[in-house]
Amino acid sequence: MIGYLALARETFDVEFAESKFSNAKSLLLSLSPSAIGFNELITNDEDASKALTFFKSNPCDKIFLFQTTFTDAKFLLNFAQEINKPICIVSFPEPRTGGRLRLNSICGLNLGMHSLIKNSITPEFVIMESD
């Protein structure tokens, strides 16, 4: 069974992050209709605890984690250590506009990968080019 969840930080464009999560989730479900997931953006410790409980109650063979915005790696590292299943982090590029990034998702991917690898966890990653 494949599982999915999404991380976000509320200081970024949460509405845009939701749309990225929705589109990516739709693609995943079209490829793996039996995939299950935590369908709320994880933006705080309470959401993180609920997501961890969900996946402990619904074991999966692999997890797709949608890094919809930049976040620190605290939840990702804790989740990976607790669940102990292969993780693929999916990130979303955005065009350079000269202004502030709306998501900064790839930076979150970089930080998450660094944290996991530093702790002897070897994730996979995908940069989802378009919706």
Show which residues each predicted segment covers.
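An N-terminal assembly and electron-transfer interface module characteristic of large anaerobic redox
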Residues: 1-131
